[in-house]
Structures are given as structure tokens and as C-alpha cells.
């Protein structure tokens, strides 16, 4: 992995870059003119200032006002580009960016901003993200770490007198990185101008958007918190009552903040009026973030961590994400079996997966921010195939064990929340991105002057004095230090085979993310399920402590029932697993590329090898699936 490139917080728009992208946009218009004129007549585009301006498509507008989520497919297919996000409006916005000739990163900017508006309980520009970009042009994958950092005034003992302040209130806020990271990715890969990518999100925030069921449910679980905070109350309640599903939510202050950033660039956030307003509100609410914190924020750009597992190459985030390392460790353990699943059924493979995950969760708390702690030895061991084989010998098919058997030393990180989406464009450039404000509605504070929900990412750090349910000591590698980034479960992945795009996937749901992404991957690429079945199949989860297998058994927002079979539960119980029903689970988005003739695909790849040159990327059928566990829907070009 090459050394990280530390990107400046970008105090103003790079006008040379903007001019170049305007030129590119103009060239794209010439080739797409007839198509765009046709689309404009049906409400998909309008033209402004001689550039293509992306607006909410007619489909997205209709979806927003009808709430007819059940009429939109959970699966779409296209050879020209697809999006899978956890909100139908945001998927359609991303697809409309692709239709106008945008790169997958252009679409990612618009989608991220949209999700931050319509799903503010999960993400927003007051939070942070991990983003993987896979570029077919040069066959490389890059990782953009825009994770929140601890403020300059932070210390490992800052919560010793009030443990609750670590998760609730402005003191729990880390320095946001999302805007800086989006700009850095756009500057490197984007084809379209910066400002138009903001317009759909601005329109939703200013003109109002319908509260979809998942947001409505989140609001209903946080009534007291919402009504207590002036900023939250102004956006998520009306006449003393919190908003309900089907009602319209407005956030004009957020619209203004987004508009300012779209015009002035990230500098408006990190060294300008938006940041100044935010810092003032944070200070008033009891936080410690200053303008120096915003000005000192840096995006980390590195080669993606690439690991070969089960015949595929997985591209993901390096630490402080524990996702790629944890995913790869479990896959290596499972790959050491000659037959992971038996002919009689999947249950034994599921037991082996649970045991492998328990070993992984025991090991991952040795990870942390590599800029502050040396994680090389821990990573090497977790990624070692020889170590995986040794662990596999400690897994018995007829029983499970108490937590101490797995040699865990530290208290587990219990991160929460997040939102994930995937994008693949016509050229097979792909983005897999997970964003978060951590808990539902983050710190429970909304900046009244900017409309920004504050994250509570400081809760993802460990502290010396905290007492956790597992009664284990906190992990020193994850202690708070100024500018440090906390450990995370976020697992955005891009999968390739012989250099060609195969899949993009990732999940939302804190500690449940890694188990969910593992199961979708296994369903799709080992059990050979169709993409829709791979995502929708019931899942199990384990955190090591408590020593309990959580199994899904619930009805989705769309009325579909998801549940683990009685035979599976009996099989696991017979091996000593304690079982607990879970009314929900992680939300996974998936895009898979398939080909009509596998032999033809293999022949093309083999020819490319023989001539020593990479041919044009293979363009098969792209299938995008949005998880029915949330009210998202995919969209196609």
C-alpha cells in the first residue's frame, strides 16, 4: 500500500479544476444533445448557465409524494450504469447524474448529499465517511478516509466525570470530514461541475421531502431527544408534535448551507461562514470544536487495501476501518475448509461462520488509527492464511465455546448507525461508500443556524475509565488523542476478478455490518444465489460478547417477512448457541456484474493475459439490489 496522501481541507474551489470540468461537460452535451432534449421534455433535466444541471427526476418526485415504495422494484438491471442506495429518491438522483455523462464519483457526491437530507438519522455533512473508488481506466482502487477526528482539545480522560457526554450532546462530536472527502474524490475523478451536484439535495431540503417509513420510525423512537433540542425540534416537529411517516419535512437552513458550499467550495465549511456558524452553535451547546479544528482537517487518500479471498480480490478501507481486515480474516478461515457447506444443508456452514466471526471480533480490537498506533503486526496476523488455518483447527463442528476461548483481551467497540450506497457507471468505474453520524441523529443536536445534525463519533473511541457490559478493559489502541480517528465497523467493498469489476457492496448497522456483508458475499459467490435472494435472505449476527446468536425474525416496511428457519435455529441450539430474536438487521446494498456466457468471459480475460495488455473493461449486465430491511430502492440508467 502506498503512503497516504494527506489532502488539504480545500479552503476554496479549485477554479482551474472547475473550468476543466465545465469544458468536459460541454463536450458531453454535444454527444448527448438529442438524448438530453428528449429527457428534458419528460422532466428529467433542465438547462442552466450553459451546463447540464441535474434535478430531481420526475420518477423521484412522484415517488416522494406517493410513498408507493412497494411499486418500485428492489432490483434493477442495466448495461449502462446502476445505483443501489437506501432511499429511492437518492438512487434516482444518482442515476440521473450518470445519464448526463457523470462519473460514478459525480453520482456519489449527489447521492451522499441527498441521503444526508432525507435520512438525517443516519448520515449528513456533519459526519464522516469511507469511500472506495475503483477506476477501470488504470485498474486501481483508491480509499478516501473522511472519518471524523477528535478535536484538538480532546483527551483520553475527557469523559471521566460524565460518561454520558461521550454519546449524547455536542461534546460527543468529532470534526466532520464528509465535505472535504467528497471534494477530494470529485477533484480526482469527477467529470461534471461541482455546483449542480448539490442542487437535488438543496431542492429537497428547501422545498421539503416526504418522511419515509424508516425515518418516521427513527423519529418516533427519539421523541424526547428531538423535542428537547431547539434545532432538532425546529426540523423534526410541528406544533409540539414530532413528524410522522407521510408528512413533509423542511430544513431551509441546511439548504442554505449546501448552497453556500456548492458556490464557494469546501472552504465555506472548513474556513468560512458555514463553519463559523456551526462552531458557534456547537460551542453554545457545550461542544469544544473550533475553527482551528475545521481548518486542520485532512482527508487521507491511499491505495485501497486489496486482499485475495476465495478467488476474488476484495478492495476496501485500511484501518481505522476494521471492516476489510475483519471480512478478509473470516473469509480466510472459511476458505481453509475443503467443503464449507455440506450436501445436507447450509446449517453447518453457518455454525462455522459464527465461530470464525467470534475469533475475528476478539482480534479486531487490536486495530486503531495507523497514524497514531502501530497496527502492522495485528493486521498481518489477521490477514495471514496460515493463522486462519490455525484458527480453523480450533473450530469444532459440534459445539461452541464461552468468550474467553477466543482469547479476547479488550472491550468491544459498539458503533452504530450509518448509510451505504454503491454506484457503477457505464465505463465500469465503481464507488462503494458508507457514511455516518453514528447513533440515530448522532449527538441529538442540530445546529440551528446551519441545519446540520452533529455526529457523536467520539463514542467510537475507547476511554480508560469506561465500564462496558463485557467487563473487559478498554482497548488502548483506540484511546482518544487530538486529530485521531476512531476504529470503525464500516465495510465498503469493491470486488474484482482478474482486474474486472465483479461487485460492489457494503452495509449500514454498526457492529452488524461485517456479519451482514460476509453473508451477502457468501450467498452470492459461494452459494450462487441470485443477487436479490443473496441480499434478502435472513441473517444471523454475533458480537462475541454477549455470547448470543441474534437471528432475524421480522416484517419489513414493505410487508415482507424475513426470518431464520426453525431447522437452522434447532441446529445451532444443539451446538450450544444461545439464540435471541432480532427485529431488524444491517442494511446491505449490492451491485453485481454478470455475463450471459461465462466461457466467453473467461476467454476474453485469457486473451488479455496472453497479449500482456488489458483490453477494454468487460461490460456485462449490472444488477443492483437495495435491501428491503430499509425503504431504499435501486435505479438504473
UniProtKB/Swiss-Prot annotation:
GO CC term (a single one): vacuole
Consequences of knocking out this gene: No visible phenotype under normal growth conditions.
Tagged with keyword Membrane: yes
Alphabetical list of Gene3D superfamilies matching this protein: 1.10.246.130, 3.60.20.40
EC annotation from Swiss-Prot or TrEMBL: 3.4.19.13, 2.3.2.2
Tissue expression as described in the entry: Expressed in roots, cotyledons, leaves, flowers and siliques.
Record flagged with keyword Signal: no
TM segment ranges: 28-48
Function: May play a role in protecting plants from some xenobiotic chemicals by degrading vacuolar glutathione conjugates into cysteine conjugates.
Protein name: Glutathione hydrolase 3
Upper lineage: Eukaryota, Viridiplantae, Streptophyta, Embryophyta, Tracheophyta
Gene designation per UniProt: GGT3
